[in-house]
């Protein structure tokens, strides 16, 4: 029987085969006509890839059926170069935890009364308990 093989370029090849022929035999015949090695060939019929050990009858390929030939892709993606940096990485600031840090905002005098050492922010957005920073000439909230 005669079958057609459509290549990637759109060219159609006719092959003389039997329904008992294996896919390996068909690929060998394509190699004779086109020069493409069988290990690079992928034959597709009715949306399925044809496996090498099977016959044409297994896939219900009849006379004047059309197979599609595509080439197998080898390997993965292109290897990427490792980035080289010209400047060294910036070191991050380390947060120093000060034990009982709240004590720096208050002072207990001789009579046992607690006094604030820093001024609280008068801004309504900040809320109670937000202290202003002491600069040599001013107090600053940051907002």
UniProtKB/Swiss-Prot annotation:
A zinc finger (C4-type) spans 121-143. GO terms for biological process: translation. The keyword Cytoplasm applies. GO terms for molecular function: mRNA binding; structural constituent of ribosome; zinc ion binding. Keywords: Cytoplasm, Isopeptide bond, Metal-binding, Nucleus, Ribonucleoprotein, Ribosomal protein, Ubl conjugation, Zinc, Zinc-finger. SMART domains: Ribosomal_S27, UBQ. It comes from the Eukaryota. Residues 1-76 form the Ubiquitin-like domain. Ubiquitin is generally synthesized as a polyubiquitin precursor with tandem head to tail repeats. Often, there are one to three additional amino acids after the last repeat, removed in the mature protein. Alternatively, ubiquitin extension protein is synthesized as a single copy of ubiquitin fused to a ribosomal protein (either eL40 or eS31) or to an ubiquitin-related protein (either RUB1 or RUB2). Following translation, extension protein is cleaved from ubiquitin. This is Ubiquitin-ribosomal protein eS31 fusion protein. It comes from Daucus carota (Wild carrot).
């Amino acid at each position: 029987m005669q079958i057609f093989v459509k290549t990637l370029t759109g060219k159609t090849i006719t092959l003389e085969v039997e329904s008992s022929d294996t896919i390996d035999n068909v690929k060998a015949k394509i190699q004779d006509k086109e020069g493409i090695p069988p290990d690079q060939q992928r034959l597709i019929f009715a949306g399925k890839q044809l496996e090498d050990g099977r016959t044409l009858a297994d896939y219900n390929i009849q006379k004047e059926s059309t197979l599609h030939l595509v080439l197998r892709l080898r390997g993965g993606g292109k290897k990427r170069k490792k980035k080289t940096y010209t400047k060294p990485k910036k070191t991050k600031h380390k947060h120093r935890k000060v034990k009982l840090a709240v004590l720096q905002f208050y002072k207990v005098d001789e009579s046992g009364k607690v006094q604030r050492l820093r001024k609280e922010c008068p801004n309504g957005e900040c809320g109670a308990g937000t202290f202003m920073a002491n600069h040599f000439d001013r107090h600053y909230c940051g907002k």
